[in-house]
Amino acid sequence: MKELWTEKYRPSSIGTYVFRDEGQRQQVSGWVEEGALPHLLFSGAPGTGKTTLAKVLLNELEVDDMDILEINASNENNVDTIRNKITNFSSTMPFGDIKYVLLDEADYITPNGQAALRGVMEMYHTSCRFILTCNYPQRVIPALHSRCQGFHIEKLDITEFTARLAQICIDEGVEVDLDTLDTYVQASYPDLRKSINLVQQNVVDNVLQRPQDGDKASSDWMLSAIEMFKAGKYKDARTLICSQARPEEYDDIYKFMYRNLELWGNTEQQQDQAVVIIRNGMAKSSLCADPEINLSATLIELQMNSL
């Protein structure tokens, strides 16, 4: 089986990790020099390198695998996980100096689970530290924010994002044209991990294939939707999105709409109005009884605006 490009090109040291802010690089280097980490809360969009940075730090500190507990909180997010799995790990002595709990997607932990986590962090802070990652820091309770050093990871700008993806294609000997690559960028930005996966999955005989219209079995239905939008097949694209999108993806779909204003009109007035339509749809999404109907209505408004 081919090696996953996301793993092949994952940074493993501070020197290979791409920091958007030199001050953050210095801060991270300072933690490594001290030989221990504080409680940390990494926030940022999906695929921007939060978990990668956490693993870079643990690698730089040469923490024994036995002293690391990694949990994906989108799957294990209740009080029982905190009370049993995490407490059992935190309460025993480390093999080295300090144990570390890496909690991915901590914003998915239930409020009761977060309250229980606060107590564990306080009780075992001398021998166990916590690294939390989240996409939506506002979903993390203030008590956890106050116990962690916040660290927001900015997304790459779209030019750097595209260049990074193109460089990987060059390194892998993949033939690609810019229009095709741009389709993948539009479907996945700012999630670099997702974009790399999509590109690798759609390489045939060392050529990056263009997504086919209406292919619901595509590795990512959003690629097909973009092709439909570009071809003026708004109804088909709307049907595909509403049938394939999971509720937790709706925020990302609204952000996709905003990033690609050119799909909703060529004039400045049309694009300004599209921003208002998207804003209204996103604001209503969490309030209405059926968010799918709200999403569909927003797409219809955008289609009418583009005429």
Where are these predicted regions, by residue range?
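Conserved C-terminal helix/linker of AAA+ ATPases
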Residues: L181, V199-I226, Q271-V275
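Charged, alpha-helical scaffolding/interaction elements associated with membrane systems
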Residues: E34, T92, P190, K230-A231
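C-terminal helical "lid" of AAA+/P-loop NTPase domains
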Residues: V101, L181-A187, R193-D205, C242, ...
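Amphipathic alpha-helical repeat elements characteristic of tetratricopeptide repeat
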Residues: P142, T159, L178, D215-L223, ...
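P-loop/Walker A NTP-binding region and its immediately flanking N-terminal helices
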Residues: M1-F151, E160, A166, T183, ...
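C-terminal lobe/lid and adjacent interdomain/linker elements of RecA-like ASCE P-loop ATPase modules
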Residues: D157-T162, E175
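A short helix-loop-helix "switch/interaction" segment in the helical subdomain of ASCE P-loop NTPases
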Residues: I170, V174, D179-R193, Q212-D215, ...
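Helix-rich C-terminal "collar"/helical-bundle subdomain used as an assembly and partner-interaction module
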Residues: I226-L307
